[in-house]
Design a protein with these regions (language model features):
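Electrostatic, structured charged patches in enzyme active sites and in nucleic-acid/phosphate-binding
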Residues: 1-133
Length: 133
């Protein structure tokens, strides 16, 4: 008799939280409580005209030896009422020293500079300053 192995359900790495956004005009699924709090912050900021969540795609060189190109998707792309733009990545400080994260951040900085856009990484320190955590 052949035994069948039960497939385990793959658990998500993130607790996805639904958020109904006024300015994005749709329901968004955050990957963390920090992102959820930032949704609320953006919706309540009168200087924010609109924002998109995980919509921007930035190519970056993942491996110099193989030439492997990957795609980095920052958390937020914000447009302000004065039409200035901002790319935001929300990341715990402890992850900022990881090589892949550094590559993604450098790619976002280059992209932002070439396109006249600001780029910031919001860690727990920045979120505390905004009273979001």
């Amino acid at each position: 008799m052949i035994s069948k192995k039960k497939k385990r359900k793959k658990k998500s790495r993130y607790k996805r939280l639904d958020y109904v956004s006024i300015k994005a005009n749709k329901t968004l699924k955050s990957r963390s409580g920090w992102e959820y709090a930032y949704f609320q912050y953006l919706d309540n900021d009168i200087n924010v005209k609109s924002y998109e969540y995980e919509s921007l795609k930035i190519p970056y060189l993942s491996n110099k030896k193989t030439g492997k190109i990957r795609t980095y998707i920052p958390d937020f792309f914000v447009t302000f009422v004065d039409d200035s733009k901002l790319i935001v990545e929300i990341k715990p400080k402890r992850f900022l020293e990881k090589l892949q994260i550094k590559k993604k951040i450098n790619a976002a900085k280059e992209y932002a500079q070439k396109n006249g856009i600001q780029f910031i990484v919001l860690t727990e320190d920045g979120l505390k300053l905004l009273n979001l955590i």
